[in-house]
């Protein structure tokens, strides 16, 4: 049987079935570049190359992440990040909002998958060409210009990469096709016939095959060298195994593959980082020791907090393992292993869920925004890297299921939301907290003495204290209760006078009982010079 397919190493792949849906604004002269006559004669995915391909003159050739353990990452879906009313968001459009992100205070941007994927309207997790950037968001030089502009503004760029699976259009799946079963054949050395775990979609890569691992490593190296990316978020790394009995448990095979990829990334660029969507707590220690970071999903407790369900809203998982049997508290993991988040692309939006209390009653909009501010404080001021999902900073309250599907296009609201005083105030609070984090890095180093009291046993108050290695202190406390109330707080010993970070006003002594509005928080510091005013 003859199989017509494209070169898996092609840097550009034309799609005769979907390219017509890409606007000339996003990708100028696309039909001219490929040729309208080819679109008429060819069918499917087509490789192309250019003998004298366009060059890009980098303005920043040697950008380096300053501190990988103090990253504040902004996860971004290009499709929905900018106005998509009349088409799709694009790389060029996203560049116009880099100042918005810089002012917010993030120092890294994580792009959801941008390697050539199935169709044009997608989250991007249906990759079929790993060396080609998807044209639905722009040209190759557009992507480079975006990364270059991020670097000029002091922001790293992390790519979300999908090596658990690929679509059946990938050449290594298509060349070994079982037409009767409509899936890849049993003699395929690259892909498994059936996935070894229940989380997979499309066709699962067989990472036990050295050819597969070399293919992945070659792709990682290409992305670093060609596009100057600063790291990767690996999708669904729990699936990197042939042993279906050890999907949820410690799996030395899987750990070995991930360490091999991390080592190769380090050899190419020892400043580049690797983050895994992993969710196997028993492996976090080994991965962290190898310099690999892992996602820490804290969506549930922060949603409970938004819904006033404080008896079960426990934030402690942000800084420690969930696995009580292993005893692997954060002290036993490499510092900075956990990349914590309140939301990612996969979870319900906290500000949508927070429209209603746990008992079903509606929470007023202004109150909900104040609770979102308190959540942000008790998220962003914890040590270790953090991730913000797009628009959480302006209280995006449209459900993940809007449009009938989690992956459907979502309405763009940034410009309108920024005109709403309460939402702008939430953005400003994020910016203030991230400025505090940037201006006081010693509070977020591995030698910080950090304590927080944030489980249900502490009622509707929540408290956080930190002492840096240089002997400075901050204290944070909030009213997470329903309505205004008095919150009693006993500040740590050793500081005579505390100062309100935002106003500079003095707080003398240890014991205080301020009357606080719902969602109100105080950030106190031990040195007047640390204050904003």
Q: Where do the PLM segments sit?
A:
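C-terminal beta-strand-rich structural cap/linker in extracellular carbohydrate-active enzymes
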Residues: 509-533
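Conserved interdomain hinge at the start of the Helicase C-terminal
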Residues: 372-373
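Active-site-proximal helices and loops of the catalytic beta/alpha 8
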Residues: 113-115, 123-126, 151-153, 236-341, ...
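Active-site regions of oxyanion-processing enzymes, predominantly non-cytosolic
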Residues: 102, 230-234, 386-392
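Short, polar loop/linker segments at the starts of domains and inter-domain junctions
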Residues: 84-97, 354-363, 404, 506-516
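Glycine-rich, aromatic-lined ligand/substrate-binding cores of catalytic
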Residues: 344-347, 369
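Substrate-binding/active-site clefts of carbohydrate-active enzymes
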Residues: 9, 19, 38, 55-68, ...
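The feature marks proteins involved in alpha-glucan
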Residues: 1-71, 86, 520-522
């Amino acid at each position: 049987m003859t199989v017509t397919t494209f070169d898996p190493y092609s840097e550009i792949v034309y799609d005769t079935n979907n390219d017509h849906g890409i606007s000339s604004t996003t990708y100028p002269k696309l039909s001219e570049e490929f040729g309208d006559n080819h679109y008429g004669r060819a069918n499917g995915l087509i490789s192309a190359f250019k003998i004298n391909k366009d060059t890009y003159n980098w303005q920043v050739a040697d950008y380096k992440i300053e501190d990988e353990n103090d990253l504040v990452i902004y996860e971004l879906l290009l499709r929905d990040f900018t106005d998509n009313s009349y088409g799709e968001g694009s790389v060029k459009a996203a560049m116009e909002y880099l100042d918005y992100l810089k002012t917010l205070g993030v120092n890294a941007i994580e792009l959801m998958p941008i390697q050539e994927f199935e169709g044009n309207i997608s989250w991007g997790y249906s990759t079929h060409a790993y060396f080609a950037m998807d044209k639905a968001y722009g040209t190759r030089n557009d992507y480079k210009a975006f990364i270059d502009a991020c670097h000029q503004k002091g922001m790293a760029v992390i790519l979300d990469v999908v090596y658990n699976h690929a679509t059946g259009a990938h050449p290594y799946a298509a060349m070994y096709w079982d037409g009767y079963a409509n899936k890849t054949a049993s003699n395929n050395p690259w892909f498994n016939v059936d996935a070894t775990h229940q989380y997979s979609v499309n066709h699962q890569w067989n990472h036990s095959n050295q050819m597969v691992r070399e293919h992945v490593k070659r792709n990682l190296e290409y992305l670093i060298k060609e596009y100057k990316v600063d790291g990767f978020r690996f999708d669904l790394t729990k699936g990197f195994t042939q042993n279906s009995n050890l999907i949820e448990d410690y799996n030395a095979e899987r750990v070995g593959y991930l360490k091999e990829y991390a080592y190769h990334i380090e050899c190419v660029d020892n400043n580049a980082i690797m983050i895994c969507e992993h969710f196997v707590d028993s492996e976090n220690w080994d991965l962290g020791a190898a310099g690999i970071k892992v996602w820490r999903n804290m969506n549930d407790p922060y949603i409970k907090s938004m819904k006033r369900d404080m008896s079960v809203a426990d934030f402690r998982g942000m800084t420690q393992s969930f696995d009580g049997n292993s005893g692997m508290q954060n002290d036993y993991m490499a510092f900075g292993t956990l990349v914590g988040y309140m939301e990612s692309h996969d979870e319900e939006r906290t500000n949508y869920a927070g429209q209603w209390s746990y008992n079903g009653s509606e929470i007023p909009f202004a109150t909900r925004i104040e609770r979102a501010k308190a959540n942000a404080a008790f998220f962003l001021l914890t040590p270790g890297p953090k991730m913000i999902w797009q628009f959480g900073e302006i209280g995006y309250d449209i459900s993940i299921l809007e449009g009938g599907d989690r992956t459907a296009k979502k309405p763009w609201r940034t410009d309108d939301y920024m005109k709403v005083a309460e939402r702008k105030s939430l953005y400003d609070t994020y910016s203030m907290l991230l400025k505090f984090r940037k201006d006081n890095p010693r509070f977020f180093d591995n030698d910080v003495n950090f304590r927080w009291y944030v489980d249900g046993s502490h009622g509707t108050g929540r408290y956080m204290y930190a002492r840096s290695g240089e002997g400075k202190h901050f204290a944070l406390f909030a009213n997470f209760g329903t309505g205004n109330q008095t919150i009693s707080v006993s500040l740590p010993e050793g500081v005579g006078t505390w100062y309100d970070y935002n106003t500079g006003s003095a707080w003398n002594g240890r014991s205080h009982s301020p009357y606080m509005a719902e969602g109100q928080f105080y950030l106190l510091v031990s040195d007047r010079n640390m204050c904003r005013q």
